[in-house]
Amino acid sequence: MERDFLGLSDKQYLSNNVKHEVNDDAVEERGLSTKAAREWGKSKVFATSSFMPSSDFQEAKAFPGAYQWGSVSAANVFRRCQFGGAFQNATPLLLGGSVPLPTHPSLVPRVASSGSSPQLTIFYGGTISVFNDISPDKAQAIMLCAGNGLKGETGDSKPVREAERMYGKQIHNTAATSSSSATHTDNFSRCRDTPVAATNAMSMIESFNAAPRNMIPSVPQARKASLARFLEKRKERLMSAMPYKKMLLDLSTGESSGMNYSSTSPT
């Protein structure tokens, strides 16, 4: 006959009983929660079936396995209730499918209005003018007219040399008075205020573009002149390096010329 003096067997027996009771309670709670979730899903399906078309309802009856609801926990239900306000504007899906997205105004694609008329912007004389309902053909015609008017404008236009002289004088005045800031700003404003005709600008550009063409024929002549100067200087260097030979050459040339003169003179 065994006796438990310390009472260890009673404590172990009590702890085992407590564990079994806790496990049984957890299993019962889990079974109740799953059962309640299934009942809630079925009631949801039957509640929404009144709003379903007859064809969808018949499909749900024909294929019950495709529309089964799984176990829904209390946390998911709380999340749906908490964030349900964000999906009020979304179109709900009846049985299964993807999660509906909220139709926020910033997510709506912006479609450009087809009735917007083309505009034409003109910059002229420091002003900006905008015209509506201008087709591309009209815009091209306006640009052609402006180009023809710019080429045909001849009134109140100064010659090119006068414009160049005035432009060079302004640059000279600006460089001479660059020491004082007041005179520099005065000259700058004077240069800015003096108008230059469009024809003068075009003629200046044409003259600058035509200048290299006029210089092309003078290039060979300049080369010939530099070559002649080079040969002349080389000849001078050679003559200065050998003066005695030059004297001998001069004497020989003088004697030969004297002999020729004596031979040709009558006796």
Swiss-Prot record:
A motif (Nuclear localization signal) lies at residues 222-229. Keywords: Jasmonic acid signaling pathway, Nucleus, Plant defense, Transcription, Transcription regulation, Ubl conjugation. Induction: Up-regulated by jasmonate, wounding and herbivory. It is found in: Nucleus. A motif (Jas) lies at residues 220-244. Belongs to the TIFY/JAZ family. This is Protein TIFY 7.
